[in-house]
Amino acid sequence: MNVKVELDAAAIKRLEAAAVTAAGKTGEAVLAEIRSAQVMPFDNGTMQNADTYATETYRDGEAVCVDIITDSPQARRLYYHPEYDFQTVNNPNAGGMWYEPWLSGGIEEDFAEETFMRLFAEEAGL
């Protein structure tokens, strides 16, 4: 039995481009969700608003990735010390380990996957 398979290279490229675009938009959506959850320590807002950003999408093997980075001098110290007494005037849910709810095992762990799938379907026209 002979089987002939033809791959539509143009369709594959469109799907790959849709995955890259959806990953970038997913990173921005997760970042917006973190900000709206008001979980980051907030004094004047610089760490949350200016020093936290989603990177450009990149490939890690077959995976398309985007990172959310908080690039400020105090971020590591605050993140890894949830025992600190964080002020909650500006962000009522402020505390350490602020990314944890969106990571595996967290209460929002499905947010990124569900958002990516929805955005990928939109971008790919599915």
Where are these regions (language model features)?
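Short, Lys/Arg-rich flexible segments
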Residues: 1-75, 80-126
